[in-house]
Amino acid sequence: ADPRFRETDVGEWQGLTHDQIERDWPGYLEAHNRPPGFESDISIVTRVTAALVDLAEQFPGGEVLVVAHAGVIRVMRRAHRVGDSRIPNLGGCEFIVRPDATEVITVGDVVELFEHGEIGEEL
């Protein structure tokens, strides 16, 4: 697994529950503020783009499945100006990577692997 596809580093919030953040950082979530050490979108885009380009060069003309957290996918979609839509659980997004092109990454639509309610509670 390539660590460059990891979830956003949330700094001092790492390991805390939503309730703990609300208690210890009142108003931060509602105001969309971030604590010290919270990874910037630029940092995420830089590391994920480098990882995608490396894969494209390793498998030229091939298709590769990358599993990443929805937060990382949303940051990449925002960076490429295709929206900030929610990524459903077990959903994803296609990224077409052409290392030698002017536009290295082209972003596709959000996809759902399963229709809502199609998966039973056994998962």
Regions found by a protein language model. Give the residues of each.
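Short, active-site-adjacent cap segments at secondary-structure transitions
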Residues: 72-74
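Domain-level recognition of soluble alpha/beta enzyme cores
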Residues: 81-107
